[in-house]
Amino acid sequence: LMVLPFMEDEHARERTIDELPQSAAGKTIMTTEPKFIPQEAAEIILPELPGSSAGMPQPALSQSVLPGTAIQGSAAQPKIKVRLIDCVGFMVEGASGHMEGNESRMVKTPWSEQEIPFTTAASIGTQKVIRDHATIGIVVTTDGTIGELPRNAYVKAEEHTVEELNAIAKPYVILLNSQKPYSDETMELAAELKEKYQTAVLPVNCEQLRKDDIVRILENILCEFPVTRVEFFIPKWTEMLKPEHPMKAEIIKTASGILDSMHKTGDVRALSFTPEQYVLSLIH
């Protein structure tokens, strides 16, 4: 929707289309190993969208995990390098394709000289994608309306994925894939998952994603990046006041309160402020 149309190199675009992962209905695992799409990150030039600030490109991705995003170029022609990683993920209860008869399917991998069970290989590959390659993550789970498996079959793998992302503070959001994303039941489940995982949970129908949905997903991911620096701008003359001066003390108290409440970039939106004697307002 928002990457392929902006790839100027026709041959690169065709190769990328050929490299896109397959998908199908049912319980059979379609992915066998991590796949980088495209092999070389696609560089695209995005037009400035209505209502956006000059020089602020609006990148997008479709699924899984997006590593190595880099923005460059002038304000008139913002560029972005984007690459998708499609990986097996952690095994969902009831999925098929990881067994040969009654025994685990054994596979050869770059990470071991010996053959290892497919489930183990999938776990190792997914962990490497999360820890070593991805810049941001998208956890795709479901309410159980998209296929043959019930909601509870996904919970263990869902929790494992979130645990891995939280362990390294990787920015991510959760997509709740549903045939009825706007129903009361789905909205209620999304609220429960948001409370459980303390991150944005967006109900969507992945088969019917629109550009607006993708922009909304990316906006929420941007709000999950950790705050590493906060700058305060105060009147120059206040810097000459002693720390114990009532005005200086109130400024320091206000700044400390802001720092204590800001952990992710999205916390700026929720920043609350009560006017005091000297500090009457904040501009952020």
Q: For each predicted feature, which ranges?
A:
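Hard-cation-handling environments
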Residues: 247, 253-275
